[in-house]
C-alpha cells in the first residue's frame, strides 16, 4: 500500500507547517536536508558496486541507462546530459529515459508512470542490449514504468540496479543491487521532489563522476576531457592546462590549438615533450593520463 511507504508518511516535525513563519519553515527544510548525506553514507558499499558495474559496462561498449518517472526521471536527465560537456564523452553513453518522454521533463505528466509496458517499449526503442547497465530510479521503489524497464532488462541479460527511498522495495526482485536512500517522511508529506529527489541526484552525481574518473576523464582533480563548446569552456581548458603544467596561458592556448582543442592531449604533449602524433597513439593505448604519461617517460 502506498500509504505505508516511508516517503508518504506525515513528518511529525512539520505537522503545523502552514502556521509557521517563513524563517522557521526554511530552518526545518534545511535541517531535514542535512539528513540526506547520512542516508547516502549508509549505502556507500552498494554505490561502489554500482560504479564498478558502470565502468565494466562502458569498457564493454555498453551504456548506462537511467530509467525514472517524474522527479526521478528529471534528475536522471540532468545528470546524464551533463556528462557530455564535462567529460567529453559521446551523447548516449549515459542514456536517461523518463516516463512520458522529453515533454515530461518540462511538464508534469504523472499518469504515464503507471504503465509497465511503456517502460519496456522505451527500452526496446533504444535497442537495449545485454552489455547495457540499467538503473531504475523511483522514490517508492514500485513505479510501474521502472518495473517494466527493469523486468525487460533482466530478461535480456542486463545487469540492473535500483535507487529508491524505502526499505525492501517491491522492485528488489528485478535489481542486482539496491541503493535504499531512506530519507524518511518529507517536509510536505509525499512530496518526493524534496529530500528523496535530492538524494537521488546526489547519488547519480557520485555514480557518473566516479565512473568517469576511473575511466581516465580527469587528471588530478581537473576535467581534462572537457568538450570545448563555448568561450567559457575554452578559457577553462586553457586555465586547466596552465595549472597542471605551470606554463603561461598564452603558451597553453597555443598547445591547445595544436592539440585540436583537446586539453588532455595538450597536457600530455607538454609534460612528455613528445609530438602530437606520438601522444595520440599513447592515449589510444591508455586513456588514463597519468598512466599514459608514465609510459612515455619510461
Curated annotation (Swiss-Prot):
<dbReference type="Pfam" id="PF20741">
    <property type="entry name" value="GKRP-like_C"/>
</dbReference>
<dbReference type="InterPro" id="IPR046348">
    <property type="entry name" value="SIS_dom_sf"/>
</dbReference>
<feature type="domain" description="SIS">
    <location>
        <begin position="54"/>
        <end position="217"/>
    </location>
</feature>
<dbReference type="InterPro" id="IPR005488">
    <property type="entry name" value="Etherase_MurQ"/>
</dbReference>
<dbReference type="InterPro" id="IPR005486">
    <property type="entry name" value="Glucokinase_regulatory_CS"/>
</dbReference>
<dbReference type="GO" id="GO:0097173">
    <property type="term" value="P:N-acetylmuramic acid catabolic process"/>
</dbReference>
<keyword id="KW-0119">Carbohydrate metabolism</keyword>
<comment type="subunit">
    <text>Homodimer.</text>
</comment>
<dbReference type="Pfam" id="PF22645">
    <property type="entry name" value="GKRP_SIS_N"/>
</dbReference>
<comment type="function">
    <text>Specifically catalyzes the cleavage of the D-lactyl ether substituent of MurNAc 6-phosphate, producing GlcNAc 6-phosphate and D-lactate.</text>
</comment>
<dbReference type="InterPro" id="IPR001347">
    <property type="entry name" value="SIS_dom"/>
</dbReference>
<comment type="pathway">
    <text>Amino-sugar metabolism; N-acetylmuramate degradation.</text>
</comment>
<dbReference type="GO" id="GO:0016803">
    <property type="term" value="F:ether hydrolase activity"/>
</dbReference>
<dbReference type="GO" id="GO:0009254">
    <property type="term" value="P:peptidoglycan turnover"/>
</dbReference>
<dbReference type="GO" id="GO:0046348">
    <property type="term" value="P:amino sugar catabolic process"/>
</dbReference>
<feature type="active site" description="Proton donor">
    <location>
        <position position="82"/>
    </location>
</feature>
<protein>
    <recommendedName>
        <fullName>N-acetylmuramic acid 6-phosphate etherase</fullName>
        <ecNumber>4.2.1.126</ecNumber>
    </recommendedName>
</protein>
<dbReference type="GO" id="GO:0016835">
    <property type="term" value="F:carbon-oxygen lyase activity"/>
</dbReference>
<dbReference type="InterPro" id="IPR040190">
    <property type="entry name" value="MURQ/GCKR"/>
</dbReference>
<keyword id="KW-0456">Lyase</keyword>
<feature type="active site">
    <location>
        <position position="113"/>
    </location>
</feature>
<dbReference type="GO" id="GO:0097367">
    <property type="term" value="F:carbohydrate derivative binding"/>
</dbReference>
<comment type="similarity">
    <text>Belongs to the GCKR-like family. MurNAc-6-P etherase subfamily.</text>
</comment>
Amino acid at each position: 500500500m502506498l500509504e505505508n511507504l516511508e516517503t508518504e508518511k506525515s513528518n511529525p516535525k512539520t505537522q503545523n507547517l502552514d502556521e509557521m513563519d517563513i524563517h522557521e519553515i526554511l530552518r526545518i527544510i534545511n535541517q531535514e536536508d542535512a539528513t540526506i548525506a547520512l542516508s547516502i553514507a549508509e549505502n556507500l558499499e552498494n554505490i561502489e558496486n554500482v560504479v564498478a558495474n558502470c565502468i565494466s559496462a562502458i569498457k564493454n561498449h555498453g551504456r548506462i541507462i537511467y530509467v525514472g518517472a517524474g522527479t526521478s526521471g528529471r534528475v536522471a536527465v540532468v545528470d546524464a546530459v551533463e556528462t557530455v560537456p564535462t567529460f567529453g564523452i559521446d551523447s548516449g553513453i549515459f542514456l536517461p529515459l523518463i516516463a512520458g518522454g522529453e515533454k515530461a521533463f518540462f511538464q508534469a505528466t504523472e499518469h504515464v508512470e503507471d504503465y509497465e509496458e511503456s517502460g519496456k517499449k522505451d527500452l526496446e526503442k533504444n535497442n537495449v542490449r545485454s552489455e547495457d547497465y540499467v538503473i531504475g530510479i523511483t522514490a517508492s521503489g514500485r513505479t510501474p514504468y521502472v518495473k517494466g524497464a527493469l523486468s525487460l532488462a533482466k530478461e535480456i541479460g542486463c545487469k540492473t540496479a535500483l535507487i529508491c527511498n524505502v526499505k525492501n522495495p517491491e522492485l528488489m526482485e528485478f535489481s542486482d543491487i539496491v541503493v535504499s536512500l531512506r530519507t524518511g517522511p518529507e517536509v510536505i508529506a509525499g512530496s518526493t521532489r524534496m529530500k528523496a529527489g535530492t538524494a537521488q541526484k546526489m547519488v547519480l552525481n557520485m555514480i557518473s563522476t566516479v565512473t568517469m574518473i576511473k575511466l581516465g576523464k580527469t587528471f588530478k582533480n581537473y576535467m581534462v576531457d572537457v568538450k570545448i563548446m563555448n568561450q567559457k569552456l575554452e578559457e577553462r581548458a586553457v586555465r586547466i592546462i596552465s595549472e597542471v603544467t605551470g606554463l603561461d596561458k598564452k603558451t597553453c592556448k597555443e598547445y591547445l590549438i595544436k592539440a585540436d582543442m583537446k586539453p588532455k592531449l595538450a597536457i600530455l604533449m607538454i609534460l612528455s615533450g613528445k609530438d602530437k602524433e606520438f601522444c595520440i597513439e599513447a592515449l589510444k593505448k591508455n586513456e588514463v593520463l597519468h598512466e599514459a604519461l608514465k609510459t612515455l617517460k619510461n
